[in-house]
Amino acid sequence: MKDLLRFFKIQHTQIEEFNAIKIALASPDMIRSWSFGEVKKPETINYRTFKPERDGLFCARIFGPIKDYECLCGKYKRLKHRGVVCEKCGVEVTQSKVRRERMGHIELASPTAHIWFLKSLPSRIGLLLDMPLRDIERVLYFESYVVVESGMTSLECRQVLTEEEYLDALEEFGDEFEAKMGAEAIQILLRNTNLKNECEYLREILEDSHSETKRKKITKRIKLIEAFIYSENKPEWMVLNVLPVLPPDLRPLVPLDGGRFATSDLNDLYRRVINRNNRLKRLLDLAAPEIIVRNEKRMLQEAVDALLDNGRRGRAITGSNKRPLKSLADMIKGKQGRFRQNLLGKRVDYSGRSVITVGPYLKLHQCGLPKKMALELFKPFIYGKLELQGFASTIKAAKKMVDREEAVVWDILDNVIREHPVMLNRAPTLHRLGIQAFEPVLIEGKAIQLHPLVCAAYNADFDGDQMAVHVPLTLEAQLEARALMMSTNNILSPANGEPIIVPSQDVVLGLYYMTRERSNAKGEGMVLTGPKEAECLYRLGLADLHARIKIRITEYEYDKNGEWSKKTNLVNSTIGRSILWMIVPKGLPFILVNQVLGKKAISTMLNNCYRLLGMKATVILADQIMYTGFAYAARSGASVGIDDMMIPSKKADIIDEAESEVVEIQEQFQTGLVTAGERYNKVIDIWAAANERVAQAMMDNLATETVMNRNGQLENQASFNNIFMMADSGARGSAAQIRQLAGMRGLMAKPDGSIIETPITANFREGLNVLQYFISTHGARKGLADTALKTANSGYLTRRLVDVAQDLVITQDDCDTFSGIVMSPVIEGGDVKEPLRERVLGRVLAEDILESNADTDSKVLIVRNTLLDEYWCDVLDEHSIDTVKVRSVVTCDTDFGVCSKCYGRDLARGQIVNKGEAIGVIAAQSIGEPGTQLTMRTFHIGGAASRSALESSIQIKNTGTVCLKNIKSVINGEGKLVVISRNTELKIIDQFSRTKESYKVPYGAVITKKNEEKVIHGEIVAYWDPHTMPVIAEVSGFIQFIDLIDGQSIVKQTDELTGLTSIVVLDTSERVSSAKDLRPTLKIVDINGYDIFIPGTDVPVQYFLPGRSVVQLVDGSRIICGDILARLPHESSGTKDITGGLPRVADLFEARRPKESAILAEISGTISFGKETKGKRRLMISPIEDGDVYEEMIPKWRHLNVFEGEYVDRGDIISDGPESPHDILRLRGVHAVTRYIVNEVQDVYRLQGVKINDKHIEVIVRQMLRKATVIRSGSSDFLVGEQVEYSRIKIANRKLENEGKVKISFIRNLLGITKASLATESFISAASFQETTRVLTESSVAGKRDELRGLKENVIVGRLIPAGTGYSYHQERVHHRHFSNKKETEKSVITNISSQITADEASANLTELLNATSPK
């Protein structure tokens, strides 16, 4: 019996080995071959007997028996009859699960078009027949005729005729032509299409046609027709003659109590199809009138449409409860569809979930598991052990013992759980550290205990979070859990390579308190023999924790032979630091402990420990730090009282000063000296500055206290104020929060992001009055609303990123490329935001680095292909090297995947990355995980306005030389430079010509220093008005107004008090309709009123004035070069939000073209201007060598940065604006676009203080660049203008080069991540991402093969993924397949030879062959 059962198990679990999956159209014969019988009746089951009706939708004869091994009438029961077909009811005796696999079919009485190929845009049927979709629909739904056979008449084939036209044609031509309606007609047309001829004909037209749109359309048709030819699909299969019926267990009918049934919507839809089909058959048999038959055919078409994709055409068919029925298409698409609900994510058994609490006494690799949970989760193991050890004779007995919870069960549980890791997961799992393995420790209670140090990785807290426990069952799973997922193996974060197991909050506070020093503490000045003595004195109460002492410290380090060498010194320290030294492992220097330890310092200590002493020491140290921190935090007794919030005495004065300044501005506004916008900006600036000053005063007050030392002198020491200690140590709170408690709350924002100009001057200690409280409620609500939106958006960004990068895996060691990208430090203003060492750490050099000695021959300092670790980065620093070329994922030459040299160090492990590492997914997680921390929108001054006064000058911080880049300037009346270019940079360079500072200088700034002039730190080198944007005169002369008509394009504002008039230009939206076309312009003319030209060109000097600009000149007044002609108040640009935060990151990765993007020069050459049209000017670039002149029409309101006669390089900015990544790629190349995207994304994250390694962003950029467009196809069979995978072009080019043929020339494309995911080679991956219907339609027509290269496809088909531990499994399969193919060919070779030679010769040859192929 057992053997029999085993036989059945084996029988069904055998799966075919497969390497690829193909999708294609099903031919009617194929559908019939799948089917086990035709479904003829719409009935489902008999309502009395509950047995399925014969030939109905649940028929047992077609689909199989309802009960295992039992026919429907009950004549044959049990296993012995298996395989018998009952002669009475016709049911085969077998397992009932065949009802999940066996399909049926419906023979349709009239052909029916498949709605996917008809309505899924672009319509495949329409494209193939070259008919508009509207015409095809009219034919299909029996409104018009289509000519299928034109004969000798004047009618065209595929011409659409209305009823009247058809009758006229019949009268005229009789039966010389044939026209039909319905799907029949379409099917005939499709069947009659000769694909090969059509294709050749189209290729001929393609070569002759010159219109772009026509070419595009023809190319589309060629691609579709070729797809049909190659895939051996027949076009007529897009029209169905046979409809397959889904197995009944996949569309179940479930009896509810009370005699009602719950049914899948598909049954309803099938029933409608069968009913209409049967009625149509009957009508055709009766030869009913044409009009009735036609109506029935149309209804059948609609029923089939609804079954396949309800709601795609017309109104969706609804069920009894008014909701649309779920069709086959709805079953697979969307979050609840087959792909995302059941294939990519499944519910898991052997799992449990519970609330988490703190386990402060656990070791890092442990978690506390409640006994009840453990007993339930490990049941099968316990049963097995009980039986094995003879406590229970059968499993049933064991079960009873476990249910009674006998004492022996608990002992066994202890035994089972030992060294059996479990996995803990906290939703949302944003990165791979959201699931880690721990060894369980049994505990009482019902909550899971979690080690406090892993909370940062899980982003968990103990306010009611829940976590899930999963048990790895097989030995391999346990091994992986222990070796790869154990929390002790995940010390470094994969996003940036820094420790993620870092103490926070209490622990930090405890260590900080312990390592602080206090003047005049008990025991100061003692000299001690070592840490043990220090602890002894502290425990006995003879010395204070903070007492300054001298102590003998022994430090160890490795010498050259790898032995420990020790050195002992007498060091100035404190009692607390000496006690802490006892837990620090051998090999770390005392200096790490001998300082006030804040969060950063502790992180550095752990990082150093990991790099110097490895993982084990680090884990032990982390645990010890945690225990110590908790203990001393408890001893410190730090707590917060209201008196800790000390309000500075200067606060009142500062606020009074600010208020008087605001009054002054108000008066200036009333006298008309400043506009409303300027007044608003200035008021906000005054309050922002006042807030800063109050905060500064408060921090000075809090941070230090004056005490008397033991010599009787007063000295300042860091304060022991509790709030200050918490903020200073980095345990909790920040200066901004303390500012609200003890300074002033400051400016608040309205919901639309504009700032309310009256600030809240009170703080929380003083308390807010009603008005102040009301103002501050805005911000609080907005915060909550934003958070909800943010989480959803961030999750969606992560999903798109994972989808685009999921198939990127490290597949080889070295691709031997010499290309790479150049790295230099990130400098913004006077600060180095990211030094070079942080950017290149863990990367591989692309070329040798030479020593930068000018006098000697430069010798190689670091050779190419070196992995830059901490040591080499120190070398770079010593030799003050400024730029380094490193290998990058973007430039890697591996065809499928990336090589480990181009990727560099695996950040989470600290050594070069292994083959099989899924770097794509890691990159996506690293970028997506901090997404929730990014703001949704950055206002120009965030929530509680957090910004000091606007910058209005450049004051430098280092001594050095001024270097001005991209500058165009004029000299004003005072002899100073005025900048008139828009992307000027001012850099300060030191004597080694390294950039120390770099600033953007705005248009209109006055620069006080010349280029290459020496400056010393603290000097102001440039200044400008931050509130307005000026228009600067570039020549001297007289002003002339054009189109400045009072009341139409401008309004004059006269000031009552001063009598000054200023002219304000109206925005086009504010003007009357007749004045919409006026272009208010200022022109500079000479004394006779003739045009003055820009020097060296024949362009007259004129300035178009944008709306809202203010002119304070009179027509005809004299002006001097460098004067301000008009001002544009900044408020207009201020209210436009800078897209920041998450939306900005999404825009960059989606490669969206910004509105009004910068215009770049398409070629290098000289600028000239051609004939203008009404609203645009014609810009021409003439290349210096021979070549065509490039022309472009640019709207007149765009401000140009170039003048006539100026030379520009390809990719130079002609008109300002945000740059479009597509333009950068086209004009400046892959490196530039990589640099642009990486820097822009990093700017957003850096603003939030999130560290992400550049290579993660580069990985995504590589995936965005994976397509290329063919420009010239060379000797290949690609079409011109076709978009192809870059790797396929590379492979094809290599092949062509070897054969000495013409190579393909191409340009790289930049696709947004959504587009790139949908454009992947794998249709399974694309379909499970978005637009499922479109992807599947397209792939099936093309008969695509999915090679199952990526991770997602393999998860969906249920195999190991080709990454991580599954990588070697896949490599082996490939190898095995290759080997067996080789054997096959050898076999065939041998059989061919043996027909001509003797047996002896054959055996000799065979041994020779085998010896040659056997591995040496």
From Swiss-Prot:
Residues annotated as binding Mg(2+): 461, 463, 465
Any Gene Ontology biological process: DNA-templated transcription
Enzyme Commission code(s) on record: 2.7.7.6
A GO molecular-function descriptor: magnesium ion binding
Residues given in the record as Zn(2+) 2 binding sites: 815, 892, 899, 902
Binding positions for Zn(2+) 1 per the UniProt entry: 71, 73, 86, 89
Catalytic activity: RNA(n) + a ribonucleoside 5'-triphosphate = RNA(n+1) + diphosphate
Co-factor note (free text): Binds 1 Mg(2+) ion per subunit. Binds 2 Zn(2+) ions per subunit.
InterPro entries found in the cross-reference section: DNA-dir_RpoC_beta_prime, DNA-dir_RpoC_beta_prime_bact, RNA_pol_asu, RNA_pol_N, RNA_pol_Rpb1_1, RNA_pol_Rpb1_3, RNA_pol_Rpb1_3_sf, RNA_pol_Rpb1_4
Key words, A-Z: DNA-directed RNA polymerase, Magnesium, Metal-binding, Nucleotidyltransferase, Transcription, Transferase, Zinc
Named cofactor requirement(s): Mg(2+); Zn(2+)
Keyword Metal-binding among record annotations: yes
Gene Ontology cellular component terms for the protein in this record: DNA-directed RNA polymerase complex
Keyword Calcium: no
Family affiliation: Belongs to the RNA polymerase beta' chain family.
HAMAP family: RNApol_bact_RpoC
Function statement: DNA-dependent RNA polymerase catalyzes the transcription of DNA into RNA using the four ribonucleoside triphosphates as substrates.
Subunit structure: The RNAP catalytic core consists of 2 alpha, 1 beta, 1 beta' and 1 omega subunit. When a sigma factor is associated with the core the holoenzyme is formed, which can initiate transcription.
Protein name from the UniProt record: DNA-directed RNA polymerase subunit beta'
Organism: Blochmanniella pennsylvanica (strain BPEN)
